[in-house]
């Protein structure tokens, strides 16, 4: 199609991308609130939190439009979660919220990662430690009312998982 348009319009269309995709994605240095981290380590299992760069990157953007995808592909994100926590229960949630209040830490919810709520647009002026709260391990059906066709589910359940559990 490009050669046809070039010939008809007598112009040359440059097909080289304006930006080159970044081969290695970078994340900023972590902003650590040490007293908060010490309590996290004592209250949560080791597999419930991570500082790993790829997880921090994944939990610092959504897929809510080309703007977010562009920023990831071309290293244009300016703010990243400092820590990712995977909550597994209501008790975990309550503990985490209380610790965040106590230590003045910013919590950001992470569901499926699409960012339809824009919660993952982390404000670049935020100076506190930012913790991404991943709810995907909260993936159970809490209750079912077959008569009224109502289901109460945990925050991290996906449509596919819900369908599978309802089939049982």
Where are these regions (language model features)?
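Noncatalytic alpha-helical scaffold of FAD-dependent oxidoreductases
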Residues: 1-168
């Amino acid at each position: 199609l490009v050669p046809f348009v070039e010939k008809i319009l007598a112009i040359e269309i440059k097909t080289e991308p304006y930006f080159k995709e970044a081969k290695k994605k970078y994340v900023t240095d972590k902003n650590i609130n040490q007293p908060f981290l010490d309590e996290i380590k004592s209250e949560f299992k080791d597999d419930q939190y991570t500082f790993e760069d790829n997880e921090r990157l994944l939990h610092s953007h959504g897929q809510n439009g080309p703007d977010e995808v562009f920023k990831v592909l071309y290293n244009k994100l300016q703010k990243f979660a400092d820590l990712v926590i995977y909550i597994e229960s209501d008790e975990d949630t309550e503990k985490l919220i209380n610790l965040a209040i106590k230590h003045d830490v910013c919590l950001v919810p992470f569901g499926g990662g699409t960012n339809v709520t824009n919660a993952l647009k982390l404000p670049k002026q935020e100076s506190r430690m930012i913790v991404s709260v991943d709810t995907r391990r909260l993936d159970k059906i809490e209750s079912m009312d077959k008569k009224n066709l109502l289901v109460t589910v945990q925050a991290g359940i996906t449509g596919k998982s819900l369908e599978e559990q309802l089939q049982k």
